[in-house]
Every structure is written in structure tokens, then in C-alpha cells.
Amino acid sequence: MASVEYLIKQFLTPDKKNLDLSNQNIGDKGAVQLSTSKNLRKLKKLILPNNNISDEGIAAIANSENFKNLTDLDIYGNVISDDGVKVIAKSPHMKNLKKLSLYGNLVEDEGAIAIAESQTLSKLKHLFITSNRIRREGIESLQKAKCRTRLCHLHVDDMKDFYYEEVTDEDDEDLINSWEEIKARAEKDGDLED
């Protein structure tokens, strides 16, 4: 991996508002270095997919005053869990976020609820949070938040995946519950050999 300062020089746009470090495998160490870089104070868009960043790295970024102007944070395909998402949801430096992509991380219900209940993320309009570990409670919290906030574009896994049909007793007629039932059915059908 090249040094983070070298990557910043290579990929920071001339106006210093966009930085795309996709697939650079910077990890937490690189994320911490980003959080202290003086070259990123004007940054509006930070793109960090597939960089092996965990909660430690995203906490450094979310808590860095360097990112107070950030409107777009793309951190899909990392290893960020609920703890990292909670830091984003509470950090005063993330208050200008309009777009957050957490696609393909390790976020569960707790992280989704933290985003849904966040007072800090009041400007968030686009949330991409599919392919995580969020279940019904988290999805429902986000959908309720969408109704009462500016969150216009919510991309979550389909709720149909979490609804299960209840099996009734009538559906149990053909179920076999013991070896004795197997033998009895085999005898009835003439399939049992002596």
C-alpha cells in the first residue's frame, strides 16, 4: 500500500473537495492518517469503498474536525459494525452529511436504529444500507425515520425477506415426525421389504 499522503496527492481533486480512494486497502491505520491530514479540510465527498476499514478507522474519520464539511461519505464494502455507525450518528462533524453509503458492511439493527434516531444526521437524504445484517426492527426504524425526516432515498433490504408464513395444523398432515410413521407409510404403500 502506498502512503496515505501520497494517495491524497494522487487522488484529491484540484479544488480539494473530492477524494476517491476506492480499493486502496488503507485499513484503519490509513483512515486514522486521513483524519489528521491538513489537506482535507475543504473535503465534501469522501469515497472509501473496499478498504478494510473497521469501527476504529471510521470513528477516527467521523470524529475528525477535518471532515466537518463532508456531505457525501461512501464507505461500502468495509467491515464497519454498529459501533462505527453509532459514532457517525452522534458525531457533530457529520452533521452536513446528505449521502451515506454503508452497503455491504456488518451493520445490524442497533446501527440502523442509531441512524434512524440521530439528531446529528438531520440533513441526510440518501442512505444506502443494503447487504448488511439489519433485520426487521432496524428496517422498520429506518422506514419510520424516513416518514418524519428529510431522508428521501432509503435503500434497505426488502422487508419481504423477513416475513415468514405461519404454518397451520392443516399444513402438518404430510409431515413425518418419527421412524414409526415412516415404516407405517411404507407398509401402507407396500414399499417395506421384509
Model-predicted regions and their roles:
Residues P14, K38-R41, E65-K68, P92-K95, ...:
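Inter-repeat linker/turn residues at the boundaries of leucine-rich repeats
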Residues Y6, K16, K125-H126, R133-D194:
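C-terminal capping region of solenoid repeat domains
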Residues K86-A145:
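Ankyrin-repeat and related helical/solenoid repeat scaffolds used for protein-protein interactions
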Residues M1-L43:
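N-terminal segments that cap or nucleate solenoid repeat domains
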Residues A2-V4, Q24-V32, N52-A59, V79-K86, ...:
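Short, solvent-exposed loop/turn at the beta-strand->alpha-helix junction
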Residues K17-L21, L43-L48, L70-I75, L97-L102, ...:
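Conserved hydrophobic beta-strand positions in leucine-rich repeat
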Residues P49, E56-N66, D72-H93, S101:
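Alpha-helical adaptor scaffolds
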Residues A31, T36, L40, P49, ...:
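Short, contiguous, helix-prone interaction/anchoring segments in small proteins
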